[in-house]
């Protein structure tokens, strides 16, 4: 696997939150996973800061892909810190695993989505492999450990069929609490 330096730089620019990962090796693996996805994707960093974060909420959604992804990471981090404050002995949260998993949860969407007629759509690849699967594949190519790949694999509906780690529960709920209200909230 040969990742071009410009994609590593782009990943770092998209994700200042990478600096929250204290383990240098995990930070590098997480950065490289995003860089590999950018290198293989038809989407550019500009696209990620422009396109809606989901295809499931209609054409008028204004929250961007990166806006949502970064919000999920911030919410997950805040939640993990509070859980460690109140439950450290009974339910400890590994903050590096949590943050890396939150950053990588939707990395597979870079392979799932395409741009057609100026709009993001699910591409042919995405019809066969949803982003939890392609995200794990990208992460494993970059040496991301199993406990982080578990978060990628289980953050979406596919994870409802298995037991989740504490960190995976946090990322799952951070993601869905900032998605479902856009799709399903009571509108008054």
Task: Enumerate the language-model features and the residues they cover.
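Acidic/His-rich, divalent-metal-binding segments that scaffold phosphate/diphosphate chemistry
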Residues: 1-120
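Histidine-centered active-site/metal-ligand motif
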Residues: 68, 105, 131, 155-156
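Hydrophobic side chains within alpha-helical segments
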Residues: 71, 109, 134-135, 178
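Divalent-cation-assisted or electrostatically stabilized phosphate/pyrophosphate-binding catalytic cores
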Residues: 119-141, 169
């Amino acid at each position: 696997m040969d990742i071009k330096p410009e994609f590593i730089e782009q990943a770092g620019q998209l994700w200042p939150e990478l600096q929250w990962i204290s383990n240098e090796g995990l930070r590098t693996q997480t950065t490289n996973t995003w860089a590999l996805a950018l290198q293989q994707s038809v989407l550019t960093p500009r696209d990620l800061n422009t396109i809606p974060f989901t295809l499931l909420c209609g054409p008028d959604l204004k929250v961007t892909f990166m806006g949502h992804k970064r919000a999920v990471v911030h919410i997950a981090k805040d939640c993990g810190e509070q859980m460690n404050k109140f439950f450290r002995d009974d339910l400890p949260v590994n903050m590096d695993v949590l943050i890396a998993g939150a950053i990588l949860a939707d990395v597979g969407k870079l392979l799932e989505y395409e741009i057609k007629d100026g709009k993001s759509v699910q591409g042919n690849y995405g019809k066969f492999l949803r982003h939890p699967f392609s995200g794990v594949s990208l992460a494993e190519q970059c040496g991301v450990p199993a406990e982080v790949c578990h978060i990628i694999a289980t953050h979406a509906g596919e994870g409802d069929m298995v037991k989740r780690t504490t960190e995976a529960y946090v990322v799952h709920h951070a993601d869905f609490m900032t998605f479902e209200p856009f799709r399903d909230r009571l509108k008054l």
